[in-house]
């Protein structure tokens, strides 16, 4: 059993394909017996993925900054709530407690979380050991959402600006994503 962080938007996109992917991922994480950790909002894709995991009988941990209104916290249907002082502390806490990470479609906050993991992997912050593998950071590329970013990262590697194993993986289907988590 792993502890898996899911990074995604607190907004609900108009496209049902992203909502469906979040719902399916939440269910699958629960079905695999993993614990889902997320940023604590009950809104948008965050709310969808956490509700799906809980409804499937999974364990869900919300890491919520104190700047969130109390009604957001009280309305959470999760296994555990961890309160932190800031968005930065939320990110640090999630990264420290998880074995693997999945990025669903999201905005700037999602990219910030994704790249925080990638940088930590490159610096071997998790292990302090260059021989120890990186924690997987999986970009769930729903309907090509991350294809432009993946192309940019490929270019950075070809140009010698991105080095070593940063743990960044991509998957275009739920099945691929779950296999990478195993």
Positions of the model-derived regions?
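A cross-family phosphate/adenosyl-ligand binding-site feature
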Residues: 1-97, 126-134, 139-182
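Active-site/ligand-binding-proximal alpha/beta "capping" segment
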Residues: 89-126, 138
């Amino acid at each position: 059993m792993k502890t898996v962080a899911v990074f995604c938007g607190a907004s609900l996109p108009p496209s049902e394909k992203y909502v469906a992917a979040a719902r399916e991922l939440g269910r699958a994480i629960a079905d695999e017996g993993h614990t889902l950790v997320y940023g604590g909002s009950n809104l948008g894709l965050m709310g969808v993925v956490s509700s799906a995991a809980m409804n499937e009988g999974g364990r869900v941990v919300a890491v919520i900054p104190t700047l969130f209104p109390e009604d957001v916290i009280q309305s959470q249907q999760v296994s555990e709530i961890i309160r932190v002082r800031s968005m930065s502390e939320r990110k640090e806490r999630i990264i420290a407690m998880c074995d693997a990470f999945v990025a669903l479609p999201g905005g700037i906050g999602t990219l910030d979380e994704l790249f925080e993991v990638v940088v930590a992997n490159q610096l071997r912050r998790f292990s302090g050991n260059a021989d120890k593998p990186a924690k997987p950071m999986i970009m769930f590329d729903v309907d090509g959402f991350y294809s432009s970013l993946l192309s940019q990262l490929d270019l950075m590697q070809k140009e010698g600006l991105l080095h070593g194993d940063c743990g960044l993986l991509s998957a275009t289907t739920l099945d691929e994503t779950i296999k990478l988590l195993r």
